[in-house]
Amino acid sequence: MHPQNYDIMAEKDLNRIKVVLVEHKRTNKWLAEQLGRDQATISKWCTNSAQPSLEALIQIAQCLKVDVKELIRFPENENQND
């Protein structure tokens, strides 16, 4: 990844946890209980003010029975050949 791309990505939402929770009619509180995490942590992940670890993303995907890729927002214009 080029440095200029990092600056652009830093300003965008990197995960779709909140969207996927809504699609599955689940709440932050439910996810916090499932993961044994503080509700404030889940809230930060859902608002993209903090990002979960890869391990946490995998656990979230398992709880929601989705592919982990559904929880990640990919930049639309990123050139994968660079």
Regions found by a protein language model. Give the residues of each.
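Short basic helix-loop element that most often maps to the first helix and adjoining turn
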Residues: 15-34
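Residues in the helix-turn-helix
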Residues: 30, 41, 70
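Helix-turn-helix DNA-binding elements, focusing on the entry/boundary residues of the two helices
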Residues: 28, 39, 54-57
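Secretory-pathway ectodomains
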Residues: 11-17, 37, 54
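Short glycine/serine/threonine/alanine-rich loop segments
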Residues: 26, 37, 66
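Short, charged recognition helix plus adjacent turn
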Residues: 1-10, 19, 24-25, 44, ...
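Recognition helix of helix-turn-helix/homeodomain-like DNA-binding domains
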Residues: 36-52
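DNA major-groove recognition helix of helix-turn-helix/homeodomain DNA-binding modules
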Residues: 55-70
